[in-house]
């Protein structure tokens, strides 16, 4: 078993690190403080291929593996976790559109989405349908050559500032089989957006409700076939869980580096606090948990690349483990800074705020446990 990276992976990771240090990290605190959505930086990321990492080359994407993408997102998140997380969502939505969409849909959207000139939102969650996503009530009713959309989506990243909504709506009966997926132009008449939500973290990306009132779209906006929407949405989420776990890894690495430096500089009782065994034990646990989370994420990404039968379970495991452990690493790094960790002069409080939501979105960590447990009860052959 070889855990080393290829020369290509090392090069991609280094490019991402340099971009993160130059284009994200110096501005992350400002974007957070002023709730600025850095579209220019995202376009710069697109110019490097970071907006189409695992989209097929035949459709204009980079054609990288999910493991490659995980390594890149990990580096981007060290510069600005919130912005990196949006880039992962854009990648997921763009992949869904290009992987399952028609030639006409790809011709309309693919090039601009992959370059970062236009941006995509993923629209699944509703006010009354969160963890129970298959119960969504937004409808898409066929009317001649069109579909007419009615309903509402909640907590949509980028909504109001993006160009296309990859949106799940009910075209048939109840349950998952009645859901279809659409590429909806964001400026369609009948679509309006709620206020930009005031959030604990992820302040560099807007989060709004999407309200659909007799929003009419052409039937050729349908992604895949009718009734396939839930399957398409879940296919996107397997990768999305790896992506968000990778963002947690990046934030935790940044927090650990900050803590490592601080405990060697900060003196109390006549010596650096890093000389105290309790601090050393804390750092040891942080590093151990971070490495364990890294390996879990990379295993799950590899399983997804191999289309292994237990890929969805492994993605759920990786998301649950990495987002929990990495939040703890960020929180411990803040604790090691004492009062300084709590003020915005240092980035620790931002790392904590930005990683907290990772335990909620792309499926709550409680739902991840449900997915894992279902598989465990069926078969333990994955061990």
Name what the model sees in each region:
Residues 116-124:
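A short, Trp-centered hydrophobic/proline-enriched beta-strand micro-motif
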Residues 135, 187-218:
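Flexible, small-/acidic-enriched active-site or ligand-binding loops
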Residues 64-65, 132-134, 158-162, 176-178, ...:
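Short glycine/proline-enriched turns and hinge-like loops at secondary-structure junctions
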Residues 146, 150-193:
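A short core secondary-structure module
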Residues 63-72, 132-136, 185, 211, ...:
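Structural signature of FAD isoalloxazine-binding scaffolds in flavoprotein oxidoreductases
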